[in-house]
Amino acid sequence: MAAPILKDVVAYVEVWSSNGTENYSKTFTTQLVDMGAKVSKTFNKQVTHVIFKDGYQSTWDKAQKRGVKLVSVLWVEKCRTAGAHIDESLFPAANTNEHLPSLIKKKRKCMQPKDFNFKTPENDKRFQKKFEKMAKELQRQKTSLDGGVPILLFESNGSLIYSPTIEINSSHHSAMENRLQEMKEKRENLSPTSSQMIQQSHDNPSNSLCEAPLNISHDTLCSGESFAGGLHSSFDDLCGNSGCGNQERKLGGSINDIKSDMCISSLVLKANNTHSSPSFTHLDKSSPQKFLSNLSKEEINLQRNIAGKIVTPDQKQAAGMSQETFEEKYRLSPTLSSTKGHLLIHSRPRSSSVKRKRVSHGSHSPPKEKCKRKRSIRRSIMPRLQLCRSEGSLQHVAGPALQALSCGESSYDDYFSPDNLKERNSENLPPESQLPSSPAQFSCRSLSKKERTSIFEMSDFSCVGKKTRTVDIISFTAKTISSPQKTGNGEGLATLSCVTSEESSAPEEALRCCRQAGKEDACPEGNGFSYTIEDPVLPKGHDGDLTPLEGNLEEVKEAVGLKSTQNKGTTSKISNSSEGEAQSEHEPCFIGDCNMETSTEEKENLPGGYSGSVKNRPTRHDVLDDSCDGFKDLIKPHEELKKSERGKKPTRTLVMTSMPSEKQNVIIQVVDKLKGFSIAPDVCETTTHVLSGKPLRTLNVLLGIARGCWVLSYDWVLWSLELGHWISEEPFELSNHFPAAPLCRSECHLSAGPYRGTLFADQPVMFVSPASSPPVAKLCELVHLCGGRVSQVPRQASIVIGPYSGKKKATVKYLSEKWVLDSITQHKVCASENYLLSQ
């Protein structure tokens, strides 16, 4: 670096090319700095030398006016080469444009790119001032007693985090802190999760399993996502393989089954919490081993008495094998079976019913067929729709026909999948499985989807009720409904209708299955597709076991909206008058079908003959139509609710006023996160909240006051963001600046209909001048919202608001617009003398 020969020089450099497009000031600035001179970026009072060449005329004039030395670039070069401070008078600057007329102002534009200099407080004055201001503010916040300002952090993923350090309202904040601390301390008293319930079930499997599902909240049970994973997973994953099943898997699968049942029939669950059937209570009290042995004895006795056929030991062994197969496959303990009896009163214990079905099949089929069936069921849990039973087969039904274990939607789809087509085609019932007394039946090969459709299309519904006595099954998306019958020997059997639906079934699929059920009902030969399952006989004297259900059935009737004229509908064919009386006496109602309890008078008036009993009841096809209508009525509100929730926008709007753009962006993000509001530019009928960045009396604030809205500060949004929900508005209301806001809001909440203030109700008719400010429309809206009357013409008005240029009357008051604005702000009519306009 050269010697500081120009240390006393403060220079301002303005060196341009002759055509005014190139700026060469930087080169000479560097040379001057090297020689110890101080170079100023602006032409201020400290400047002593101006290095000038083809610069601005204003710079030349200013230098001459101040008496600053004007030198050329040659002076700088001479000083550098000589190494000394040369006399400025030897190298005066020349202004070539001084004597030219300035008719056209030539705009200089440097074509050279500017060097990017990172702004720091040292090289940028504005940045330095801003930095000093922030430092002072930070120091003030540290020393003040109120604490610091809230901090907003924007993370890399775009999420917004609020870290408040200031207490808006100390009492409000402390109460909130105490509440959060209390919730943390009481966390162990919250509802147990499903995993905790499974752990509890290990300690006390007989009691806790019955109680744990009932402790779950109703909302959790009935949500569409609660147990979707359990329903759609395979049975092997839930229950394990047949060889290695431990107690934990048994309990897990059983609990999932119980939960799904509770979700399925939520209407009945409410009543089941207070009512329980005595018949199921006595089943629950008995031990599991005794219960199973009783079932086997009852079945053997029934087969001996009714069919006249003694069961051989081989058949007993086959029945035992089928029971073991079912236990290994489904992992349902007898205790859990009786538990289901408590949870769903209108549903038999499924494990026992399906075991009985297995026993009945096993007594007439060889072990090879059972092995095949075991393999096929491992792939498809859905029970096959067996082809027609004979008249004699119905006589084997010792109790009400009951539906088999219902499975999830995935099982239903799996049955019709191409993977199982081969198995279903090869699955034949052997001739030995048919009873000797049964008449000719269909081929027992399972039908494919195309064959089923073709048979449904050719079906003749005229033969309904003529010949068959089998119990038909109506499928509502894997719902199998069976209506029990009372046998001819006069045993007092409690009849029960079973509805078991899967947890989540699409309404469209349900309606489609309802239509398929209507087609599937009958066939040209008069034999319907049916599935007859034997059920354990309840002891005599239990005819009244269904009385707790009657109240529940009335609730279900109201929910489905079915008419009393449909009470005669039934899902089973009536064989004789005794069966018809038993059917009408005990026939229950269930969701998705139109069966209603027949009154005692109708039961007594039923004819004794079979033909009369059939005449009094509608055909099967009519019942199916009514069932479909009832099911449509049931699912229609849920569909409409989902659509309305999906397409519905928030009805409340939020308006921002006097808000900087940074805060507006924050509010938009918070509203998008917490929902519940839509942002509007101006106050309208749906506006409930007005957010003001500064306590200024804007038009939106006045309209918000007139409409009874919350007028809040920006901090309400920040605190709501911190707590994750919209909090109470009262601590953040700007009532000090706008005293009318809480008063109008209270009046709005107390008003029955649409709110309209009474501030100007006693004032005469007003006319708003077109030249008024705020605009006429907004001012008229304010007057109208506060109960005033506005005229379109001045001759009908006694008060004129705003500047009026027409002929003035002595009887009319000419007031300023501030009279309206101040009256609304203070919530009282201000004295008009202070707002009179000059005549």
UniProtKB/Swiss-Prot annotation:
Entry keyword annotation includes Phosphoprotein: yes
Reported function: Implicated in chromosome condensation and DNA damage induced cellular responses. May play a role in neurogenesis and regulation of the size of the cerebral cortex.
BRCT domain mapped to chain residues: 1-93, 644-734, 755-837
Protein name: Microcephalin
Superkingdom of origin: Eukaryota
Subunit structure: Interacts with CDC27 and maybe other components of the APC/C complex. Interacts with histone variant H2AX under DNA damage conditions.
BP terms from Gene Ontology: cerebral cortex development; mitotic cell cycle
Ranges of biased composition (kind: Polar residues): 564-581
Compositionally biased spans, kind Basic residues: 343-361
Domain comment in the entry: BRCT domain 1 is required to prevent abnormal chromosome condensation. It binds directly to the SWI-SNF chromatin remodeling complex. BRCT domains 2 and 3 recognize phosphoserine/phosphothreonine marks on proteins with high selectivity, and mediate interaction with phosphorylated CDC27. They also mediate the dual recognition of phosphoserine and phosphotyrosine in the C-terminal tail of histone H2AX.
Annotated positions of the Phosphoserine modification: S279, S287, S296, S333
Organism ancestry: Eukaryota, Metazoa, Chordata, Craniata, Vertebrata
Subcellular location: Cytoplasm, Cytoskeleton, Microtubule organizing center, Centrosome
Cellular component GO terms held in the UniProt record: centrosome; cytoplasm
Entry keyword set: Cytoplasm, Cytoskeleton, Phosphoprotein, Repeat
Disordered as annotated region, ranges: 337-376, 417-442, 564-586
Residues found modified as Phosphothreonine: T335
